[in-house]
């Protein structure tokens, strides 16, 4: 008999956030859980096989196995290069 564990899948945009709780079979990967959650019905822009993901704010691989109680977070792509943004802020501060 396939044992089930409880996990959560979360994703958010500035205008909408969703947290889904679900039961998945032991041995499921992060990618499996994203697909099983149905979160793509809320956010069609998510491509499960290409998503950047993590568990409790720590980046992880789609092939990682989940544990009971894990919160799988799907991350949005960066809109700006962090290094460039730091340079711009530093330049702005030096002008003051």
UniProtKB/Swiss-Prot annotation:
Q: Supply the name of the protein.
A: Protein RnfH
PANTHER family noted in UniProt: UPF0125 PROTEIN RATB
Q: Which organism is it from?
A: Psychromonas ingrahamii (strain DSM 17664 / CCUG 51855 / 37)
Q: What's a Pfam family in this record?
A: Ub-RnfH
Q: What is the lineage of its organism?
A: Bacteria, Pseudomonadati, Pseudomonadota, Gammaproteobacteria, Alteromonadales
Question: Which gene is annotated as encoding this protein in its UniProt record?
Answer: rnfH
Q: Which family does it belong to?
A: Belongs to the UPF0125 (RnfH) family.
